[in-house]
């Protein structure tokens, strides 16, 4: 490889811009993520549930690794995320954190608060969040709208960074009537906007938007001034993107979600597939609003 190729972090599937290459070499912190967002650089996130895949994702240039409660479906064989326990989350976060430390990785590690671990009270949420942080998380993620704002504020005031989650929230999929696009009507879009601003005002620094119309997600991304949006099935104009590891590697025995691209296609290995994902998000070729969004 030539010196110029090395300096721009070229991969077989695209070239990361110099800012992305620099970000991959330096430890990722929350201020750093928000600085990247402020200068217009797309953020990348993937799920990982074990030490090896987490280390490979970091080596591929992924800035944020999410130990999601999706592990219930892709690792434990559950039919939904609602059966995942706090103990299981801590186990997988510990595994991922060890892998990242061993690899001297730079990625920012986020852990999902599982169903039932933060619903009872702010104090319950603090105990659960503390368990995830002690397991190795840098940030916790929780699902829900305005009712979670008080909990978000309570955690942030105690030094725990929070990622919020609106749109399709898998922990409440039964109440939503299934895995459906959220925010399609004028009323539901207005509600989501209000909730997003409430969560930002409470201190949420990141906000996952799942299965949200691309136009609404773009509008929210423009409106939120100190909270970076991370899309999954929310179009290309969010501040960043996240996919479930197994989906983007094509490891799915069922129907692949519309918003997923199989990055293993044509890739010689897992790391190269992850590099292709990072490059595609950074250069704006993924997601494609005509194929992967509503």
UniProtKB/Swiss-Prot annotation:
Superkingdom field: Bacteria
Gene that this sequence comes from: panB
Annotated region (Disordered), positions in chain: 1-21
Catalysed reaction, written as an equation: 3-methyl-2-oxobutanoate + (6R)-5,10-methylene-5,6,7,8-tetrahydrofolate + H2O = 2-dehydropantoate + (6S)-5,6,7,8-tetrahydrofolate
Cofactor comment text: Binds 1 Mg(2+) ion per subunit.
Chain residues that bind 3-methyl-2-oxobutanoate: 69-70, 112, 141
Key words, A-Z: Cytoplasm, Magnesium, Metal-binding, Pantothenate biosynthesis, Transferase
Pfam families hit by this protein: Pantoate_transf (PF02548)
PANTHER family according to UniProt: 3-METHYL-2-OXOBUTANOATE HYDROXYMETHYLTRANSFERASE
GO BP term, pick one: pantothenate biosynthetic process
Cofactor(s) the protein needs: Mg(2+)
Active site: 210
Subunit structure, as described in the record: Homodecamer; pentamer of dimers.
GO molecular function: 3-methyl-2-oxobutanoate hydroxymethyltransferase activity; magnesium ion binding
Positions annotated to bind Mg(2+): 69, 112, 143
Entry GO CC: cytoplasm
Compartment(s) of residence: Cytoplasm
Organism: Albidiferax ferrireducens (strain ATCC BAA-621 / DSM 15236 / T118)
EC number(s) per entry: 2.1.2.11
Pathway: Cofactor biosynthesis; (R)-pantothenate biosynthesis; (R)-pantoate from 3-methyl-2-oxobutanoate: step 1/2
Entry protein name: 3-methyl-2-oxobutanoate hydroxymethyltransferase
Family: Belongs to the PanB family.
Function summary: Catalyzes the reversible reaction in which hydroxymethyl group from 5,10-methylenetetrahydrofolate is transferred onto alpha-ketoisovalerate to form ketopantoate.
UniProt cross-references to HAMAP family, sorted A to Z: PanB
Gene3D superfamilies: Phosphoenolpyruvate-binding domains
Biased composition (Polar residues): 1-12
């Amino acid at each position: 490889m030539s010196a110029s190729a090395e300096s721009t972090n070229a991969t077989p599937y695209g070239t990361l811009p110099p800012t992305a290459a620099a970000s991959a070499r330096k430890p990722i912190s929350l201020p750093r993520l928000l600085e990247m967002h402020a200068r217009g650089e797309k953020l990348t996130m993937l799920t990982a549930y074990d030490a090896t895949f987490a280390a490979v994702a970091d080596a591929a240039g992924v800035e944020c690794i999410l130990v999601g409660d999706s592990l219930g479906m892709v690792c434990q064989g559950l039919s939904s995320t609602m059966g995942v326990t706090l103990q299981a989350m801590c186990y997988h976060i510990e595994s991922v954190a060890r892998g990242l430390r061993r690899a001297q990785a730079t990625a920012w590690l986020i852990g999902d608060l599982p169903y039932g671990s933060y619903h009872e009270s702010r104090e319950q949420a603090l105990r659960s969040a503390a368990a995830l942080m002690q397991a190795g998380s840098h940030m916790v993620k929780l699902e829900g709208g305005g009712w979670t704002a008080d909990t978000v504020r309570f955690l942030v005031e105690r030094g725990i960074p929070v990622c919020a989650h609106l749109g399709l929230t898998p922990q409440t999929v039964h109440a939503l009537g299934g895995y459906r696009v959220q925010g399609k009507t004028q009323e539901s879009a207005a509600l989501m906007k209000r909730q997003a601003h409430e969560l930002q005002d409470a201190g949420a620094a990141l906000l996952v938007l799942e299965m949200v119309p691309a136009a609404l997600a773009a509008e929210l991304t423009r409106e939120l001034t100190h909270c970076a949006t991370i899309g999954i099935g929310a179009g290309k104009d969010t501040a960043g993107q996240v996919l479930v590891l197994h989906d983007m590697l094509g490891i799915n025995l069922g129907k692949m979600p519309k918003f997923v691209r199989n990055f293993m296609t044509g890739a010689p290995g897992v790391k190269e597939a992850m590099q292709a994902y990072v490059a595609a998000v950074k250069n704006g070729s993924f997601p494609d609003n005509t194929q992967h969004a509503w």
